[in-house]
């Protein structure tokens, strides 16, 4: 697919989702935001994958609602019909844990979780570290802070280690992925 076509579809979806809200089981409304869109084409069909979220997470029911709404709007839009002249398949889902974080909103909702961050340090070296994401700085130079203190099984009467904190500016982050904890 041409990049300009993808950009037009993405802009259209951003505008469509800009004012969208979904409800949680308690009836509270949550603003939807678009995390990413991927469009794949094969010989007979275009596949549009929409990765959406809310600040409090997104449910399967929310994704089903969004899918129906987006599909109806795509079908009704002459602009989208021109960009998608053949059959398309729409897939709406959460970004999931395997996708890197790309937006401040995603970072905010993951404070306190384990993360793996790949970044370029001041010397130009690419480093990957694991740590507990403890803070997000959005003022001045945006950055995240991780506690990279190794979690070790406690020995009786052992002194806990002081936290070892690493602050990484957003401009140096290449990939940040939330880790699954059991």
From Swiss-Prot:
Annotated TM spans: none
Coiled-coil features, chain-numbered ranges: none
Keyword Metal-binding: no
Keywords: Cytoplasm, Ribosome biogenesis
Superkingdom of source: Bacteria
Pfam families per UniProt: DUF150_C, RimP_N
Compartments in which it is found: Cytoplasm
Disulphide-bonded residues: none
SUPFAM superfamilies for this protein: YhbC-like, N-terminal domain (SSF75420)
Main location: cytoplasm
BP GO terms, sorted: ribosomal small subunit assembly; translation
Entry keyword Cytoplasm: yes
Functional note: Required for maturation of 30S ribosomal subunits.
Family stated for the protein in its record: Belongs to the RimP family.
UniProt-recorded name of the protein: Ribosome maturation factor RimP
Gene: rimP
């Amino acid at each position: 697919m041409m990049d300009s076509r993808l950009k037009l579809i993405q802009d259209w979806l951003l505008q469509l989702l800009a004012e969208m809200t979904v409800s949680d089981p308690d009836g509270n409304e949550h603003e939807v935001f678009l995390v990413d869109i991927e469009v794949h084409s094969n010989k007979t069909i275009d596949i549009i994958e929409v990765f959406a979220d809310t600040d409090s997470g997104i449910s399967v029911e929310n994704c089903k609602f969004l899918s129906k709404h987006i599909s109806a709007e795509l079908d009704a839009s002459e602009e989208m019909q021109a960009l998608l002249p053949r059959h398309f398949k729409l897939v709406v889902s959460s970004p999931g844990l395997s996708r890197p974080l790309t937006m401040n909103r995603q970072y905010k909702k993951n404070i306190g979780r384990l993360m793996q961050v790949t970044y370029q340090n001041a010397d130009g070296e690419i480093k990957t570290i694991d740590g507990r994401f403890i803070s997000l700085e959005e003022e001045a130079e945006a950055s995240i802070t991780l506690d990279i203190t190794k979690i070790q099984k406690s020995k009786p009467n052992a002194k806990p280690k002081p936290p070892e904190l690493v602050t990484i500016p957003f401009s140096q982050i290449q990939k940040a992925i939330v880790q699954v904890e059991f």
